[in-house]
Amino acid sequence: MTEAIKTDVLIVGAGPCGLFAVFELGLLDIKVHLVDILDKVGGQCAELYPEKPIYDIPGIPMITGHGLTESLMEQIKPFNPTIHLNEMIESVEKIGDPEFRVITNAGTVFECKVLVVAAGGGSFQPKRPPVPGVEAYEGKSVHYAVRKMEEFRGKDIVIVGGGDSALDWTLNLNPICKSMTLVHRRDDFRGAPHSVEQMRQLVASGKLDLKIGQITELQGDNGQLSGATIKLNDNSVAQIKCDAMLPFFGLTMKLGPVANWGLQLENNLIPVDTGTFETNVPGIFAIGDINTYPGKLKLILSGFHEGALMAQKAVKYVYPDKRVVFQYTTSSTNLQKKLGVN
């Protein structure tokens, strides 16, 4: 067997919650490795909405998913975590009290005192629209996420869906595209009321073509769209020109190997103690979207709070004989020295 990498804590998931947990653990002199199945840090922020504005991070009126990821990476620099990308945890074995041996699909072996599951909703993939042949255009002119807004400048865009993502990208991309069509199966939208109002203003001003119906056929060649056929709710048919399509039908979440780790599960989520965010297995914690408890809000800021409380319990496993005194970064010269600001 490959020689094990020994670390205090192994975090599964390098999204915002996992990254901020590095910061909280680092303040307590805890060494951390992270593993993520994606090829980049940032989790859903980086993979699904790197340029989408986020408005509910405390003290930051607006930041993109990419911007938040960069800021978190800058914040954890003093603690020099080791990040393993393109790897998925395949097995977890308890070898101590507590101590775990963790093996990835790449054969990397870890031995850690604490395991933190910060894997969002598990592995996720966009739901494919029920349009024949759509897979031939995926990645070329059919996109399930906007990674660079500039790629859509001057294009004829069709956006499909009626939720927040569809409305948000309708509003954000409308100023830079050549033309835009929004297609939804009914004239009733699930997004924020303010976004719905702004969308209808674009329709009224002639800047957005709203079609109530469903796309039934795509036209194009070699992965490049040229048009789409829409069956409208009045049974008529509309033909539109488009060279890019953005379907927002939500995500299919799969818990993946986490389901085989001996953790208690509730509707594919992990119940936790809200004082420590520890699972039913001592030494294994769950923070972020993957956990559940009464009153749970799936917000980034909630995951930050969970990471802070998790660290206060994790340190007792890492340093069982050490008396830990709670300190504030604003006044502790010790913490400021760790952060390189003193």
From Swiss-Prot:
<keyword id="KW-0285">Flavoprotein</keyword>
<dbReference type="GO" id="GO:0050661">
    <property type="term" value="F:NADP binding"/>
</dbReference>
<feature type="binding site">
    <location>
        <position position="44"/>
    </location>
    <ligand>
        <name>FAD</name>
    </ligand>
</feature>
<dbReference type="InterPro" id="IPR023753">
    <property type="entry name" value="FAD/NAD-binding_dom"/>
</dbReference>
<dbReference type="InterPro" id="IPR022890">
    <property type="entry name" value="Fd--NADP_Rdtase_type_2"/>
</dbReference>
<feature type="binding site">
    <location>
        <position position="124"/>
    </location>
    <ligand>
        <name>FAD</name>
    </ligand>
</feature>
<keyword id="KW-0274">FAD</keyword>
<comment type="similarity">
    <text>Belongs to the ferredoxin--NADP reductase type 2 family.</text>
</comment>
<feature type="binding site">
    <location>
        <position position="17"/>
    </location>
    <ligand>
        <name>FAD</name>
    </ligand>
</feature>
<feature type="binding site">
    <location>
        <position position="89"/>
    </location>
    <ligand>
        <name>FAD</name>
    </ligand>
</feature>
<dbReference type="InterPro" id="IPR050097">
    <property type="entry name" value="Ferredoxin-NADP_redctase_2"/>
</dbReference>
<comment type="subunit">
    <text>Homodimer.</text>
</comment>
<protein>
    <recommendedName>
        <fullName>Ferredoxin--NADP reductase</fullName>
        <ecNumber>1.18.1.2</ecNumber>
    </recommendedName>
</protein>
<feature type="binding site">
    <location>
        <position position="289"/>
    </location>
    <ligand>
        <name>FAD</name>
    </ligand>
</feature>
<feature type="binding site">
    <location>
        <position position="36"/>
    </location>
    <ligand>
        <name>FAD</name>
    </ligand>
</feature>
<dbReference type="Pfam" id="PF07992">
    <property type="entry name" value="Pyr_redox_2"/>
</dbReference>
<dbReference type="GO" id="GO:0004324">
    <property type="term" value="F:ferredoxin-NADP+ reductase activity"/>
</dbReference>
<feature type="binding site">
    <location>
        <position position="330"/>
    </location>
    <ligand>
        <name>FAD</name>
    </ligand>
</feature>
<keyword id="KW-0560">Oxidoreductase</keyword>
<dbReference type="InterPro" id="IPR036188">
    <property type="entry name" value="FAD/NAD-bd_sf"/>
</dbReference>
<feature type="binding site">
    <location>
        <position position="49"/>
    </location>
    <ligand>
        <name>FAD</name>
    </ligand>
</feature>
<dbReference type="GO" id="GO:0050660">
    <property type="term" value="F:flavin adenine dinucleotide binding"/>
</dbReference>
<keyword id="KW-0521">NADP</keyword>
